[in-house]
């Protein structure tokens, strides 16, 4: 029986944790990143939240890590659709603007999971656009 592919959108905090966190915090991220049953999804917003800071701080290894991830991920560039869906989700669920854009991108990419480091008490978990998963739960 063929295994089901899990369409996975990683929030920026997950990628930052994967590279910068203490080993015990990196473990859950590495399990996700190394899961052969996952296909990764992304938006230009994740790229913007991660890559420029690594470049500014001259952290070449971190920059290469992000670039490797982005080459592997399927990215949407439909800004008009992301902005429209994100606005509606922010108004409906009260999520913050950047989270709304990430959730909209995940929804448009038909993600099965949106994985975040945001605690379950945060507004991103109120969204119903996509299944929101706390990385550390």
Language model: regions and residue ranges:
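A general structural signal for well-ordered alpha-helical segments in protein cores
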Residues: 26, 47, 63-66, 83-86
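Active-site charged/polar residues at nucleotide-handling catalytic sites that mediate phosphoryl
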Residues: 36, 93, 109
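Short, well-structured N-terminal submotif of metal-dependent ribonuclease cores
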Residues: 1-42, 54-65, 136-137
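Alpha-helix capping/helix-boundary segments
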Residues: 14, 46, 82, 102, ...
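Acidic, PIN/NYN-like endoribonuclease modules and their adjacent C-terminal/linker elements
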Residues: 1-7, 32, 49, 75-76, ...
């Amino acid at each position: 029986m063929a295994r089901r592919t899990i369409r996975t959108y990683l929030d920026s905090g997950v990628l930052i944790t994967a590279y910068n966190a203490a080993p015990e915090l990196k473990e859950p991220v590495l399990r996700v990143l190394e899961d052969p049953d996952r296909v990764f999804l992304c938006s230009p917003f994740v790229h913007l939240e991660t890559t420029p800071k690594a470049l500014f701080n001259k952290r070449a290894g971190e920059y290469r890590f992000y670039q490797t991830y982005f080459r592997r991920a399927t990215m949407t560039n439909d800004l008009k659709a992301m902005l429209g869906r994100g606005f509606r989700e922010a108004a409906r669920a009260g999520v913050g603007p950047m989270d709304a854009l990430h959730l909209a991108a995940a929804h448009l990419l038909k993600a099965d999971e949106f994985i975040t480091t945001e605690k379950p008490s945060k507004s991103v978990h109120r969204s119903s656009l996509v299944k929101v998963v706390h990385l550390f739960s």
